[in-house]
């Protein structure tokens, strides 16, 4: 039996004008793909009742599953419930379950349950409620002829929770028993999508068509998906999974088991296994590396201290960086960042450290050290490694990448990985 036909209908004037970028359809497509369903049509329409009725009528007649996104709010341009009722020739009525949810939602927040809010409880009479723990608007479901229609909120995190926790399980329960869905997700760092695709094309040119290979760019990790919906693909997958892992090498962080983990989580896990403590010495990142480590529950077992020494004066006062190094080499230099790393280890009782000093911009760059230049030092007191990079990003993105690279370098160090990837464009100061 073939897979059900899935279509998406998104509504909102903001989507049509570009005031809001549509990320919901991409997320829905990814989640549905994980259960073996592809989206064969997506339509975006303005908040226009006639347009919505026409699209719902047509899409419900040409699909097995229709997910409508947006238009569930309390304002005059939220038209999904009304349009659906007209399309399926149903009546609108106040739904008791939706009203109870709305009443509780307003009461918990000290808000007034007024006329506009009550609109969110006026739904097609035949619908079933889909609970929304994250917002005031419930979702709802109707079966119309051969089509299952799900109406969902436009707020991304409300949609994602509803989709994953309720809609996908409901869809999965009705899928054909012979429909195979097998998905493996890998986390990769230090390679971009185009670079990775080039490597795969060169080293794995015979990649089987039975296994779909997909990429999902993140910040900072890249997710690689191996998906198959056939018995042939299921048989081939372990072989090609291993081949891909070999090609990825030490860029492969992990296989995602439940939910993705951050670089900081992976590093802390390694430190916990070996009962090691880490410290940080940061200048250009302003404590971001320490923040990423300490936002994880249980990090106090392995995180010793974080030194944010933004000025040269405080680098000397807190980490004993010799003042002469600033005069001779500048704050953004290998000599200074090594001194910061050693100082952080001496001042604390940590076993490992990561230290960074760079030019985050947009000002402060020179011909010798342009904006985006950063020196990193990491390791233990008797084995400090260094690297200099030029990261051509705006300030916030620069800081994010420096923090991620610092965590990855320490991960590699702890795993005894001697190779250091050229994360983007390595600088070599031959005059020092």
Swiss-Prot record:
InterPro entries: CinA, CinA-like_C, CinA_C, Competence-induced_CinA, MoaB/Mog-like_dom_sf, MoaB/Mog_dom. Pfam families: CinA, MoCF_biosynth. Transmembrane segments: none annotated. It comes from the Bacteria. Belongs to the CinA family. This is CinA-like protein. It comes from Colwellia psychrerythraea (strain 34H / ATCC BAA-681).
């Amino acid at each position: 039996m073939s897979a059900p036909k899935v279509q998406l209908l998104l509504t909102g004037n903001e989507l049509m004008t570009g005031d809001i970028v549509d990320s919901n359809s991409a997320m829905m497509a990814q989640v549905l793909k994980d259960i073996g369903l592809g989206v064969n049509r997506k339509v975006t329409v303005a908040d226009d009742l006639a347009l919505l009725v026409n699209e719902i009528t047509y899409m419900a007649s040409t699909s097995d599953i229709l997910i409508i996104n947006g238009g569930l709010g309390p304002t005059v341009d939220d038209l999904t419930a009304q349009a659906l009722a007209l399309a399926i020739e149903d009546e609108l009525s106040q739904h008791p379950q939706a009203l109870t949810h709305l009443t509780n939602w307003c009461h918990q927040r000290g808000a007034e349950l007024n006329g506009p809010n009550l609109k969110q409880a006026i739904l097609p009479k035949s619908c079933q409620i889909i609970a929304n723990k994250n917002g005031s608007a419930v979702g709802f479901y109707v079966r119309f002829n051969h089509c299952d229609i799900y109406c969902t909120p436009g707020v991304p995190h409300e949609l994602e929770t509803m989709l994953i926790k309720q809609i996908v399980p409901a869809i999965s329960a009705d899928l054909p028993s012979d429909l195979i869905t097998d998905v493996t997700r890998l986390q990769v760092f230090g390679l971009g999508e185009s670079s990775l695709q080039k490597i795969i094309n060169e080293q794995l040119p015979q990649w089987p068509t039975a296994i779909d290979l997909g990429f999902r760019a993140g910040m900072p990790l890249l997710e690689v998906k191996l998906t198959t919906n056939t018995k042939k693909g299921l048989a081939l997958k372990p072989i090609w999974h291993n081949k891909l892992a070999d090609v990825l090498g030490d860029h492969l962080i992990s296989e995602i088991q439940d939910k993705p983990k951050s670089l900081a989580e992976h590093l802390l896990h390694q430190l916990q296994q070996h009962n090691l403590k880490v410290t940080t010495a940061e200048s250009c990142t302003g404590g971001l590396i320490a923040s990423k480590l300490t936002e994880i529950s249980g990090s106090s077992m392995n995180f010793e201290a974080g030194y944010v020494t933004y000025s040269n004066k405080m680098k000397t006062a807190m980490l004993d960086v010799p003042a002469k190094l600033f005069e001779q080499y500048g704050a953004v230099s290998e000599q200074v960042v090594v001194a910061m790393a050693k100082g952080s280890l001496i001042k604390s009782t940590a076993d490992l450290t990561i230290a960074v000093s760079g030019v985050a911009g947009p000002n402060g760059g020179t011909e010798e050290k342009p904006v985006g230049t950063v020196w990193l030092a990491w390791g233990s007191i008797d084995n400090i490694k260094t690297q200099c990079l030029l990261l051509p990003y705006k300030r916030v993105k620069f800081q994010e990448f420096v923090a991620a690279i610092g965590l990855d370098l320490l991960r590699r160090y702890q795993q005894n990985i001697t190779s250091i990837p050229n994360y983007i464009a390595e600088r070599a100061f031959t005059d020092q």
